[in-house]
């Protein structure tokens, strides 16, 4: 497999060129804070570049003629470079420290690599620190890896007052000992508001070499696997057969990269499901008939069988028998009615279901079938059935035996009337035992359409019966479309990002304030806002440590709305009343790591617990995460800190695959999850 660097060189002819702001007369230009060389391929922080007039900069090493101040002289043709010579080159990490002389509300940093055609010193892994005194730096506000090319790099992060900024180059992109920077800028927000206690916290930022338009949690490692398309910043004009991926390891903070060619599949805009064996099944998209399989245990991509129908923007869902159902997807592969089909992990084949008609689930989108069969809200349920909760007003039951079938489940309505279509809204099964699904947001049309605050609770019964549907609370605080969400261990649903009016590849009308829905109280609660726009092509996933991974947006090539990063949201249940991280309960032992549906598991913990839940490992793209669902567990205390519980006996509730087991104490603080595989 090719490394990103070689792929960047292959695509150099189509990469965007940095824009140069003309210098004033006099040659070297002004060192003031206006961004000198703004890339068209990444989103800058919201705010303005800080004047560099009075800055003092220091670096750990410098070559004569390439001193520290060359990175703030306003001239893209000069650069700071660490020492090199016959006596040996100092190895990274290398540090570049800025004293701005006054305290600023800092929310980002930009770094322009050297522009002379030489790659020496390009920064790979890096960390960004802030300090008020130049001595106490704390933990990084941003870290990760930048894509290896010459365009401007950004680190966007939550606003903090600071006087000092430090960029640490942990590695060089090509494994060399040097670091070089042509220009560096620091950004300021217009104001700063300290996070309110009790509403969770954002940060740190994880810088990525790609725009993560799709992602999954690797169940055997806990790493976040992400991918974009054949390019790190765009999907259009794909030659096919190539996907750029990245992985972030929460335990080390390291971002790694891989270019996948073995499956000959550009996996942009796919359907994604974790099958009953735990493999991640990625279907269609830019290569509209292809299937790729990711095996977490071997960290390998495997070619899968072609689908019967070419698809893009379809959804898929794992069923009670571990097979995967998919339907729709007219974004690519032709515009026509794309009925259902099923993938069998055992036979590695796709089978058409000609009577599982797509027509009943179409929205009335003004762009027609090209959009109206996109992103279905699908839930594998009992007896091999699949429930379609939206985004169309119409709900349906799909059946997957023989030639398939479909039966109306009525409309998504309440005492407030029939809900409109909610394309690019969200649907989350927060209590699979009771069949509870929360739906919220979206808009009548895919794009150029105002979002809604509508929210509903759908309660499923037996397949084929009409579900009960009621309005949830008073709806969302904020109208949203292109937002994302995850179910949390305590049964609440975290909702973030989105736009008030859906316009793909624009960061207009963003919603920065997330919400949490608490079902016991039937109430939505505002949380602390973030400062990075997350709209079209953003993703969210629940991490095994109970935090939320939220990233991406854009993937539009030569635009200013590409978000090469992610953030971590820490829910309030991980803090104590003093605002410090709470002491977590720990699972010290599980009687098994694999259990059949209906089986019992005994666990030991280091302290008393009161609740437990299973949450299926998630996959996410284009507002869809059909894999996540939560099972609240009934605990039996065996004495001391030993507990047991039974997994539901219906595989339509406890879908086969990998699950996260969380336990919670009386304060509601969750443990780090243990991974449990549920089998049939």
From Swiss-Prot:
Boundaries of every F5/8 type C domain copy: 42-189
Pro-peptide region(s): 25-41
Obligatory cofactor(s): Cu(2+)
Keyword tRNA processing found: no
Disulfide bond sites: 59-68, 556-559
Main location: secreted
Cross-link (3'-(S-cysteinyl)-tyrosine (Cys-Tyr)): 269-313
PTM per Swiss-Prot/TrEMBL: Galactose oxidase contains a protein-derived free radical cofactor. In the active state, Tyr-313, which is cross-linked to Cys-269 via a thioether bond, is oxidized to a radical and acts with Cu(2+) as a two-electron acceptor in the oxidation reaction. The cross-link is believed to modulate the redox potential of the tyrosyl radical, which is further stabilized by a stacking interaction with Trp-331 in the active site. The post-translational formation of the cross-link is closely linked to the propeptide cleavage event, and both are copper-dependent, autocatalytic processes.
Residues that hold Cu cation according to the record: 313, 536-537, 622
Signal is among the record's keywords: yes
Kelch repeat segments: 223-268, 279-321, 323-372, 436-490, 492-544
Broad enzyme group: oxidoreductase
Active-site residues, Swiss-Prot/TrEMBL: 536
GO molecular function list: galactose oxidase activity; metal ion binding
Catalytic activity: D-galactose + O2 = D-galacto-hexodialdose + H2O2
Enzyme Commission code(s) on record: 1.1.3.9
InterPro entries xref list: FA58C (IPR000421), Gal_Oxase/kelch_b-propeller (IPR011043), Gal_Oxidase_central_sf (IPR037293), Galactose-bd-like_sf (IPR008979), GO-like_E_set (IPR015202), Ig-like_fold (IPR013783), Ig_E-set (IPR014756), Kelch_1 (IPR006652)
Subunit structure comment from the entry: Monomer.
Protein name, UniProt field: Galactose oxidase
Protein species of origin: Gibberella zeae (strain ATCC MYA-4620 / CBS 123657 / FGSC 9075 / NRRL 31084 / PH-1) (Wheat head blight fungus)
Primary gene name: GAOA
